[in-house]
Structures are given as C-alpha cells and as structure tokens.
C-alpha cells in the first residue's frame, strides 16, 4: 500500500475489515439457477446463501443491498483468507505468502479470482480488486467516504465510444486522457476511472486485447458500463506475477457481468 493510500485508508473506520460488493447477475448465477429469478429475488437468495456460509465464521455485517448488488463487511480472518487461497485455481502454493502477510499485519486482499466457491452453491465467483487505482486512491482523489465503493464500482461511460478511440486515449498522457473522459464520467470519479484505464493498459497488467473484448461485450449488449470490478480481476493476475505491488484490503467479489447500480 502506498503511503498516501495507507493514510486515506487507515483513517476509515472500515480499515480492519474487508468490504465485499457482490453482484447477483452473471453466467455463473444463471447456471446455478439464481439468474432466472427476478432481481429482488436474486438478491434475497444470494444474501441467504452468503449469510448461511460466511456467518458461521462470525463478524458478517450487511452494509447495503439493491436489486442487483449486495455490500457486506467481513472482518479480516487469516484462516478464511488461506482457505479461499487454497481453494483457488493455481493458488495453493501461495498459502505461505498469505500466512506471512497475516503475521506481519499486511493487507493481503489481492488473491485473484476464486473459482467455484462451494459455499456459494457452486456459483462462479471472482474476487477482484484494482491494484493500480485502488479504493484508497478513490477516497483520496474524490473525497468520498469508503462506503461509496458501491457507487465507484458502477462508474460508467455515458454513451458508445469507438474501441479505437479508447485504445488511443489509453496511450496518452494524464492531461489528454482526463480531458477526453470529461463528460463521460461524474466529475468526482473522473480521475480514478481514467487513471485505472491508462495505468492498467500501459503497465501491461491488462492486455489491450482483453480490455477491448471486455468493452465490446458491454457495448454489444447495450450496457456501456465499464465496471471496475470486472477489469480489476484481469489486472489482478499481474499482482500475483509480481508485476505490481499489493496495496489495499478492500475486495470486490463479482459474480459476473452485472447491470445497473444498487
């Protein structure tokens, strides 16, 4: 975690916790039968599943809910983190790293994607965070409270933009890119979004082809949202490969490509 990020993040009462944002729409949930339900029913069913499986370990607090997302707080538990890591594809070898991080009191939220998380009824779960523009950075840049992560996750481009133009903007400097993004994002969220897109692509953590395909999917399906949670998941692999420092202790659990805001 950067010094600036640590200062912003540790000043929040949520510092000792992980905050999860769980979307209730996506291929994994459709396969599990949840996607066939009405939006409110999806939320109810997933909330019951989460409560039943995670509450056994204690310290589960639901922060907010809506038609398509649930936000809840689960206090740090090294054993829980190790369990998730060991159940993740290709991550069993990282248990020692997480144990050492826990002993040192470091945040160890960047544990990539959690596949087929059994305690959530077989739904495909992806544990995402953004290693370049982190929630702590969002707090520092925007002045928003940490609880506003629900809004930040749903930052969206307001209108179709050509993929070629987005690619060009990702290669520009900060001033040029910020100017291009102006009007497409709420002003308070502008720098966080533009910074993430530019940093993720230019650093090589997020390959342009993946970024392009992701954006095309949203556009082709009539949803112009570029969700931080989805993009953060791809960038996370760079963290595990040592291409970027691990930074913060807020994790976004994303069950698939979502729609709308809470």
Where are the regions a protein language model picked out?
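Extracytoplasmic/periplasmic ligand-binding sensor domains
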Residues: 199, 213-217
């Amino acid at each position: 975690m950067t010094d600036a990020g640590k200062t912003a993040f540790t000043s929040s009462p949520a510092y000792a916790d992980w905050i999860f944002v769980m979307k209730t729409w996506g291929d994994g949930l459709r396969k599990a039968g949840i996607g066939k339900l009405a939006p409110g029913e999806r939320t109810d069913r997933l909330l019951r599943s989460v409560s039943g499986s995670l509450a056994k370990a204690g310290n589960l607090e639901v922060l907010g809910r809506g038609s398509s997302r649930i936000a809840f707080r689960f206090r740090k538990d090294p054993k829980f983190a190790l369990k998730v890591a060991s159940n993740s594809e290709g991550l069993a070898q990282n248990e020692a790293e997480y144990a050492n991080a826990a002993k040192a009191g470091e945040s160890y939220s960047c544990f990539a994607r959690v596949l087929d998380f059994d305690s959530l009824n077989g739904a495909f779960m992806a544990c995402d965070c953004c290693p370049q523009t982190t929630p702590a950075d969002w707090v520092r840049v925007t002045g928003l409270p940490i609880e506003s992560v629900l809004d930040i996750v749903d930052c969206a481009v307001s209108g179709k933009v050509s993929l070629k133009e987005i690619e060009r903007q990702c290669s520009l400097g900060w001033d040029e890119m910020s100017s291009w993004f102006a009007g497409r994002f709420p002003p308070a969220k502008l720098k966080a979004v533009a910074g993430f897109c530019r940093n993720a692509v230019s650093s090589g953590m997020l390959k342009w082809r993946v970024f392009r395909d992701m954006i095309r999917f949203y556009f082709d399906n009539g949803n112009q949202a570029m969700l931080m949670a989805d993009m953060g998941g791809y960038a996370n692999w760079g963290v595990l490969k040592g291409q970027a420092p691990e930074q913060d202790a807020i994790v976004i659990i994303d069950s698939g490509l979502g729609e709308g805001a809470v």
